[in-house]
A protein has these predicted regions:
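Extracytosolic ligand-binding ectodomains
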Residues: 2, 9, 22-388
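Sec-dependent signal peptide hydrophobic core
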Residues: 5-15
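N-terminal signal peptide c-region/cleavage motif recognized by signal peptidases
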Residues: 17-19
Length: 388
């Protein structure tokens, strides 16, 4: 074969490789562009800020160590204000203008559901969203990857156990009137079937509500002694706080959405007794093991405040991405990344998160979950993992 023919073949191969790289948006020779949508100025801004900080910490660590196969991460974060309409606009900007490779740790159920069609149209992965809705892995889509057992399963699994332990006469529900709250409601209804019970009363509130007097009054009037909460931060605090003022003290049972130190920090002693499902444990620094204290000190040095469990969610999302992208190798395309995820196992971490396992048919990492309760102003784990 002539030298000129060798040269032509080499040139053609280089063009082909360049074309493949060019077709994978968000990936260049020295950079990977990731996008995230958080609530930075709405009702869940406390969560969104923490998730963002956790992501930034892990991104900085990775970049300081040379990146992923020689590529640094550039993280772009947009504010949804916890509004699905804003989430669509943010997704359009990140996907179509900023050309992100993947959407990572997007906060909110309705917000993810609104944004995913924009992403999937451009072959952009939805990676480790910060919501436990089933829609994060159902119906199956090759670009969906979730790591939190769904709200539906959390309530369906633990509510019968709560009933058997507390022996309530009337189980009721207060829930946010959107996809998140409906998942909690469905889980409660299904879980009660296992103990031959039904909800005696149920009532909803609009996203962003601040007054829960009428909802609590309905619970009290129906003599509800176990109340399932499809609530997040201020709705949880508002509901329980209102109940305490009325001298109404049922057992309150929430989901992982209410598992945050903000509940007892902002709600005070009235929040004692609240149960919530969870996986990753909140890092209380005065009782944490040395690896967590070391990590928390790095966090505090960078942001001048203590981390919380949502900081961990953000940190872990980037860490899992880095594991998968690193194993994918230098030829980082969406298809190659998905193939890596199809066989990825992530071991349990220093925060007590369960092992995650993915496969070509399995787009959720784990169904494992456990239960915590606020006791003496802090969350205490009160059950072992189930569904492992």
């Amino acid at each position: 074969m002539s030298t000129s023919r060798h040269t032509l073949i080499a040139f053609a191969l280089s063009l082909s490789a360049g074309a493949v790289l060019a077709q994978t948006q968000g990936v260049s020779k020295d950079e990977i562009v990731l996008g995230s949508i958080q609530d930075l100025s709405g009702p869940l801004a406390g969560f969104g800020k923490s998730v963002r900080q956790g992501m930034v910490l892990r991104v900085d660590e990775i970049n300081e160590q040379g990146g992923i196969n020689g590529r640094k991460i550039r993280l772009l974060v947009e504010d949804s204000k916890y509004d699905p309409r804003n989430a669509v606009l943010a997704a359009q900007k990140l996907v179509n203008q900023e050309k992100i490779f993947a959407m990572i740790a997007h906060l909110g159920t309705a917000q993810n559901m609104a944004a995913m069609p924009v992403q999937f149209q451009k072959n952009v992965v939805n990676f480790m969203p910060v919501t436990a809705a089933r829609e994060m892995y159902e119906p199956f889509h090759k670009l969906k990857f979730a790591n939190i057992g769904p709200y539906y399963e959390q309530v369906r699994t633990f509510l019968p156990r709560m009933v058997q332990e507390k022996k309530p006469k009337a189980v009721c529900a207060i829930y946010q009137d959107d996809e998140f709250g409906l998942e909690v409601l469905r889980g409660a209804e299904e879980g009660l079937k296992a103990v031959n019970m039904t909800l005696v009363e149920k009532t909803s509130f609009k996203r962003g509500a601040t007054d829960f007097a009428s909802q609590v009054a309905r619970m009290k009037a129906a003599n509800c002694d176990l109340v399932v909460l499809g609530t997040i931060i201020r709705e949880t605090i508002g509901t329980i706080g209102t109940a305490r003022k009325l001298d109404y003290n049922p057992t309150f049972f929430g989901t992982q959405a209410a598992y945050t130190d903000l509940i007892h920090k902002l709600g005070g002693p009235a929040m004692n007794g609240l149960y919530a499902t969870m996986t990753t444990q909140h890092p209380y620094l005065d009782e944490a093991a040395q690896p967590i204290r070391f990590w928390a000190n790095k966090f505090k040095t960078k942001f001048n405040e203590d981390p919380n469990v949502f900081s961990v969610y953000g940190y872990n999302a980037i860490d899992i991405f880095a594991r998968a992208a690193g194993r994918t190798g230098a030829n980082l395309t969406t298809d190659n990344f998905v193939k890596t995820m199809d066989s990825l196992t992530v071991p349990s971490d220093i925060f007590g998160s369960p092992e995650l396992r993915f496969s070509p048919q399995r787009r959720y990492g784990s169904m494992a979950m456990r239960l915590s309760q606020i006791q003496d102003g802090r969350w205490k784990v009160v059950s072992d993992y189930v569904n492992q």
